[in-house]
Design a protein with these regions (language model features):
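Conserved amphipathic alpha-helical segments that form helical-bundle/coiled-coil interaction surfaces
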Residues: 25-105, 122-125, 137-152, 156-159
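A short, mixed-charge helix-start or loop-turn motif at secondary-structure junctions
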Residues: 14-19, 59-60, 105-112
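Short linear motifs at protein or domain termini
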Residues: 1-32, 38, 42, 163, ...
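Short, highly charged C-terminal tails/helix-capping segments
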Residues: 158-172
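Hydrophobic/aromatic-rich alpha-helical bundle segments in the mid-to-C-terminal region
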Residues: 107-113, 135-139, 160-164
């Protein structure tokens, strides 16, 4: 399709060359998902609200892989409930681009109990606002959620980079180095 060829593929190439582009996509998601949440609060049908709720409940899975997949479905269900095909297709494209690079980060977020708890509370706040038709509340809740995701992913990446630097240091940080220096 046109969007696959002209949007998704070039972004996938950028992501393959430099995974930090995922943060650029996350910034774009702020604008798009805030809008999908706003429109979903105004337009969601009872059936769409039920689908959003079911996707949310699936994010509570103890299996981090299933929970992270359900997280994607949750966000896409909100986009579907916005009744805006451009927003929905854009969201689908973003998740297609991010699928491989962010899957690991999503799984890590779901493995850390305090992070998992905060994600759950944030998702619930988005749902609550959508279900009562509070468009501004839904937009704000989604922006707060994505801000938290952005901060958490950056922290995980920084921790991973710090760990990689430490393991490359020579010296007495591990048993094998001490034995060689003795």
């Amino acid at each position: 399709t046109w969007s696959e060829q002209n949007i998704v593929q070039p972004l996938k190439t950028l992501m393959a060359d430099d995974p930090d582009y995922s943060f650029d996509i996350l910034e774009a998601r702020y604008a798009i998902e805030a809008s999908t949440a706003w429109h979903a609060a105004m337009r969601a049908t009872p059936g769409e609200k039920e689908k959003i709720q079911l996707c949310f409940e699936a994010t509570l899975s103890e299996d981090p892989d299933l929970a992270s997949q359900a997280d994607v479905r949750f966000h896409l269900a909100i986009a579907e409930a916005s009744h805006n095909i451009v927003l929905l297709q854009t969201m689908r494209g973003f998740f297609d681009v991010l699928q491989s690079s962010v899957k690991h980060s999503r799984q890590r977020m779901y493995l850390v109990p305090p992070v998992f708890s905060q994600l759950t509370e944030q998702h619930q706040a988005v749902i609550d606002a959508i279900f009562v038709g509070d468009a501004d509340g839904a937009r704000k809740a989604m922006m707060a959620h994505l801000s938290f995701v952005h901060t958490t992913m950056k922290r995980f990446d920084e921790d991973q980079a710090r760990h990689a630097r430490i393991t490359r240091l020579p010296g007495d940080h591990n048993e094998h180095s001490r034995e060689k220096n003795a």
